[in-house]
């Protein structure tokens, strides 16, 4: 996520298959989100390679595992300078009341949100966060990942599907 923003790309955090009840449903959902976000490249964890490749192929989108992408030689490029009103990332709604909708979040909006977290939660470097929220979810991404980075707070993360199945384990 951070590397995409740094490079001037718009990361689009998308859910993993555990939330859709089956391989075909996940491929369908992912293909629709790819169509609406029109990415240049879909990066995915190797364990969902077959589903990610199928969804990307439907949309004519390049796809590569994070692991393969990380092995690429870094090109020599000049990184873009972001302006406050440039888009920072795309965030999809959960789709609990209708189909997930993509929302463009600017750098300014994200920084205001992070500032609000720091001020209202009085975060300090001795604080620690434990979260099971997935990073494609707004509270998981902003509240439990980016806010921790911005405020130098330590975090421990539980796998969302494992926590949902056995929250007291």
What are these regions (language model features)?
Residues 6-73, 80:
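Structural core segment of the AMP-binding/adenylate-forming
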Residues 13, 42-43, 130-131, 156-158:
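Short catalytic-loop micro-motif centered on adjacent basic/acidic residues
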Residues 94-97, 133-139, 161:
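Active-site segment of SDR-like NAD(P)-dependent oxidoreductases
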Residues 111-128, 138-169:
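Conserved AMP-binding/adenylation subdomain of ANL enzymes
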